[in-house]
Amino acid sequence: MKLQDLLIYAPNIKFIKKNEWPEEILAISALDALLESSLVFIKNNKFLQKLLANIDKAVSLKIGVILDEKFFDQMKPEFKVELEKLPWLAVTPQLSLALTQLSKPFYDKKMANVNTQVDGRQMGTTDIHPGAFIGQNVFIGEYVKIGSGAEIMPGTVILPFSEIGENTKVYPNVTIYPFTKIGSDCRIHSGVVIGSDGFGYTFDKGSHLKIWHTGGVIVHDNVEIGSNSSIDMGTFSPTIIGQGTRIDNLVQIAHNVKIGRGCILCGQSGVAGSVVLEDYVILGGRAAVGPDTHIGAGSQLAGGAKVGEGAVWPPGSKLGGHPAKDLKEWIKGVAYLRNVSLREKSKE
């Protein structure tokens, strides 16, 4: 897409600096996965600091930036000076709307060659190792790669440009969306959906407008995913499941989540968008983690615990309750309330 064409899709954008006109804008980037000749969105200081920490890399990759106009107007002058090193800058009074509007043409571009209707084996475009086992009634999309010893059971759908590693077992009726990468020695149980659209919308003029996702999912080696769990694709960069992680049945993992190595997510737990779970975190049954939360390595959430949006918990935390707090503190609070209620009851 040409730079000036951005205005066709998002007319509220205003260019404030154009040091260099890129030949073409190739994609929208996430700040933790910058792509060459792409654009990023900056809505607040948290995102700004991420970009400024990698400003030299952003300049070399010819990254352009669209910022929230009010945030830019209030920005410190020294930050503006740093941003002016980039090829181009723009602002908009409705950043979420601009992101939504621009996500669609880049989604259309990425999906233009994704044929979800024809089995890639008929087209001769798949790369399936002779040592893989493919059951009946399996759909394998174009450009799918399946490694030696992998077993794909009946009823599974693997959409184009996805990869299945060696010795991975995919049980019946699993759905794997495009641009999903699953490592070796994994076990994916029946009913799992990997790579479905993230739950992202912008409300404008009475409608919920869809944010079109292109990030895909990466599942590393030796991961087990229980039946009827769902892992959403990232918005512009992958949702990531770390090596050796174990996911129980009926678990929801939202877009842009990054789960470390050796984590355990028990049944009906839920992880909201852009959460980071470091290595060996444990979520008890029905535990829930709010968006943009960061939970340190080795932390444990008791069953039913609810961690609020944007919380940061250090390594080794043990949490319980809603809103989540230190487990011992929560238990003491529950005991105190029980004692108070018993005393009141005894007065009746």
Model-inferred region functions:
Residues 1-124, 180, 185, 191-192, ...:
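Terminal amphipathic alpha-helical/low-complexity segments used for targeting or macromolecular assembly
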